[in-house]
Amino acid sequence: FCKIIAGQIPSKKVYEDEEIFAFHDIHPWAPVHFLMVPKLHIPSMAQVAPGHAGLLGRMMALAPRLALEQGCKPYPEGGVRVVVNTGLEGGQEIHHLHLHVMGGPRPWLKG
């Protein structure tokens, strides 16, 4: 993700500030699916240190706001899912900490 943040690999940007970069997932699992990454390279949640608490708190607080801007309905009727995969057995494929932010209608659940 460092190359995406640096603009060396194209992405569809959702948000950027001095510490955080968010962009659409190239293989979405939901109508709204984007990734939020810290610009600081942290390989995974397993390497998070106490000094990263403010950054991660900002990311978690920002996720639902960005999801609303991308078309998710607000809580409680709508909502959002935030997922962090950590390590091989946790499903992590890219070794740069990232949040998957997903939401939107799920018509397959209606029955």
Predicted regions and their residues:
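HIT superfamily nucleotide-processing domains
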Residues: 1-111
